Amino acid sequence: MAALPTLADIEAAAQVVYQDFAATPQYRWALSSERLGTECWLKHENHTPVGAFKIRGGLTYFDQLARRGALPREVVSATRGNHGQSMGWAARRHGVACTIVVPRGNSVEKNAAMRALGVTLIEHGDDFQEAREHAMQLAAERGAHMVPSFHADLLRGVATYWWEFLRAVPHLAVVYVPIGQGSGACSAIAAKRALGHGVRIVGVVSAHATTYADSIAAGHVVQAPVTTRLADGMACRVADPAALAILAPHLDHVVKVTDDEVAAAMRDLFTDTHNVAEGAGAAAFAAAMQERASLAGLAVGLALTGGNVDAPMFAGVL
């Protein structure tokens, strides 16, 4: 299993993150608590400067490159959107060129947000895996630095949001976290272990992109088709082996949520909090609602991981 960041690592990462923005809020929303039938806290990662938690990992990844004197001329990576915005933000901060590969048909508004951060955007392939393979090829051809979607230096930054959450609401009994490439869920595990917290961590996958659920059940990486229409942040076809090695022994269990359940959660969160949640951002609430009967009397923490959904799609959901 890959080494998880220590408490000292996470505290140092927080100081890097806070050079760009303050700790995000977490609120106990009355209507969401009423809907869930128990104390419900939301961690608002949709309030970062790129509208998603990924920026934290981008900042610490580039900080580590700078500390090693290894900042490249150009970075290349692949994304469905939020990781790409993270890379664009951090690359611009350090004066590094950034090329991002997205699959064809990617979110129009996420693409626009990346371009606004100075990213050179390339559309290639029919899903994230094909975009990733093309990005690796481009990086090799150009002599550029390929940034993976899962890496220890990304993890230490992402772990800061769970460190914030568990310190702010120490009585949380169970938390739900969506799994895309795995950094968010692995960071929850890292923060829990670093703080010596007893919280149960429940992973959430799309029922239409089940590679992590299938791989955990099988004990090895299992590819699974991706057919989700809403949860592009969880649209992963092949689980990352390093992430899988961390998740498998430490998740309490994994919940699969359908697009219909995600859509209902997006509507509920907007009604209850007037915050916009993208599909992956609403998945944790969808999973908690699915398990509502078992949560009575527990303090439940949910990661609203991002709010970057195209307006026409969100209007259709509402």
Identify the role of each PLM range.
Residues 1-318:
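PLP-dependent amino-acid enzyme catalytic core
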